[in-house]
Amino acid sequence: GGVKGARLGGEPPGTPCVPAEIERLLPESVARDQDTTATRIMDGQGTKTDWLAYQGASYFRTSGALDQYGMSARGLAIDVAMPWPEEFPRFTQFWLEQTEPESSHIVIYALMDSPSVTGAYRFDWVKHGGVVVSIRAELYCRKNIARMGVAPLTSMFWFSETNRHQATDWRPEVHDSDGLALWTGSGERLWRPLNNPPSVRTS
């Protein structure tokens, strides 16, 4: 159903933003005293499927038209596949724009923070069969960043039916996703099957 607005983290205790029907569902410590940077928007009363989910750090995802999860998206990736550890920015605060009950459209604002970057995001979610999200971000770097990934996606892949010879497992395929479907700005549609090489590769 629709969400009228909620304090999902960051504001001082007592900020009058959480409607009673939502606040009753949250543990007292979470609803009033602690930051909450992971949350789910459910399909409606009596369902167990997610409309969308923010999963901590800068991860977010939606289950799509068939209620099947695959890839997760991230707000930002910093120093992926570098000789030093990757940095994981996180969303620290969320705001939900007021919507009508049972609305298929929701707007969420989020602040991001990390040692290297800070920024603000606007997520415009529309559910009509599948889910489409339009994202606008303003990012401010605190220092030089060797490698920054904008609009990164993440998933899990061991092997698929196309490279079954790489595996020593009885199952025909083991993955959350087996390829990347691209719809370019020029209207071209591309399909890139995933692979599991012995070393990191970029393209």
Which ranges hold each PLM region?
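Structured loops at beta-to-helix junctions and adjacent beta-edge loops in soluble globular domains
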Residues: 42, 111-113, 185
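A contiguous, surface-exposed recognition patch within enzymatic or periplasmic domains that forms
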Residues: 52-54, 58-71, 146, 150-203
